[in-house]
């Protein structure tokens, strides 16, 4: 695989229809490892409202929402969020991502996560980023490990997925810069 098969950028209002299509197309796949989304999540209007809110969140340093685009044609194939932003002495956040199942296994998610981590460290000056993944989703754990995250432990009964509380593997990456 050659370098740079995908790129990330902040989501824009014009992305609502394409994001909705990605979520609809992958609903069954995403629901295996994610909290159940309300029906409205799969509407263009809801995605548009999320994008509008994401701009305010970014300005107020609360959350950063990106889309993952295939470099060849610019098509949106996924999304990545930096959320649960904590400043002050912690300077950390949590990363979450989803990628169209048709593009899994090609290294695209790892590449996109690396790009967002670089931005988070260099531009946003985070000290630490945490990622969590279901032990039933070894592919997601591998994404984080390949992006430089290290395992820290298991968060017991952490997230309710499909009506059942599940454990999650906790991984983190530390900014190597001393200038934070």
Which positions does each model-derived feature cover?
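Conserved GNAT-fold acetyl-CoA-binding loop/helix
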Residues: 31-52
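A short helix-loop-beta-strand connector motif used in the catalytic cores of GNAT acetyltransferases and
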Residues: 39-40, 52-67
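Acyl-donor (CoA/ACP) binding surface of acyl/acetyltransferases
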Residues: 1-18, 23-32, 65, 69-180
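Bulky hydrophobic/aromatic packing residues
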Residues: 29, 37, 59-60, 165
